[in-house]
Amino acid sequence: MTGKLSKRMRMMRDCADTSIQYPVLDGLELLKKMARVKFVESVDTAINLGIDARKSDQNIRNNVILPHGIGRDIHVAVFTQGDNIVLAKNAGADLVGLEDLYDQIKNKNYRPDVVIASPDVMNVVSKLGPILGPRGLMPNLKMGTVSHDIAESVKNVKSGQIRYKNDKSGIIHATIGKINFDLIQLKENLEALIVSLKQAKPILYKGTYIKKVTISTTMGRSISIDRNSLCVVIN
């Protein structure tokens, strides 16, 4: 026997029509209207791409600085040595070191959101592959987390840089802020992500690149967005 829908679930069902693609500001306003939990939810997006995720040359992996951040402090660990230690600390890194930091992460005493490394210490960091890899934290040159300019990399992350990559279905999942952001902030963050996605489009790709854009909150249902309402050219 099917249980009764909660008051919140009924409200979400009645508010959002899954057959409609909402203008982005209307969709974001709906998310705010449906937010009824007792914590500040994240606002997430799922962007369906037309790529074939089975082909390595079509996979997307990139980063972007969201103009308004994501609404929480990002804990950054930096593997480096020498003068870079002071530079990383001054840039706002939460934990900086080499062997001591290696031990903390290996023993699971510290769980950073982002790990950055200078190239000269990657021989140490690579040993943490079994721990960092599954969590998507292994420093990577393309993602800007292996860098000669440690201070700049830390500042980028602290100022709202997010990393993204497509899943096996060719979908990009990313957080674009908190439900207590104003509508324009959320819209501009979403648009910044889409601009970055366009820049990461495979050179030889043909066809519709961005097929569908949906938004949701941590505990809410998805709302489909009319791509034409965004202030960027989608394809």
Curated annotation (Swiss-Prot):
The keyword RNA-binding applies. It comes from the Bacteria. InterPro entries: Ribosom_uL1_bac-type, Ribosomal_uL1, Ribosomal_uL1-like, Ribosomal_uL1/biogenesis, Ribosomal_uL1_3-a/b-sand, Ribosomal_uL1_CS. The keyword RNA-binding applies. Keywords: Repressor, Ribonucleoprotein, Ribosomal protein, RNA-binding, rRNA-binding, Translation regulation, tRNA-binding. CDD domains: Ribosomal_L1. GO terms for biological process: regulation of translation; translation. GO terms for molecular function: rRNA binding; structural constituent of ribosome; tRNA binding. It holds the Pfam family Ribosomal_L1. GO terms for cellular component: cytosolic large ribosomal subunit. Disulfide bonds: none annotated. Binds directly to 23S rRNA. The L1 stalk is quite mobile in the ribosome, and is involved in E site tRNA release. Protein L1 is also a translational repressor protein, it controls the translation of the L11 operon by binding to its mRNA. Belongs to the universal ribosomal protein uL1 family. PANTHER family: 54S RIBOSOMAL PROTEIN L1, MITOCHONDRIAL, LARGE RIBOSOMAL SUBUNIT PROTEIN UL1M. NCBIfam families: rplA_bact. Part of the 50S ribosomal subunit. This is Large ribosomal subunit protein uL1. The lineage of its organism: Bacteria, Pseudomonadati, Pseudomonadota, Gammaproteobacteria, Enterobacterales.
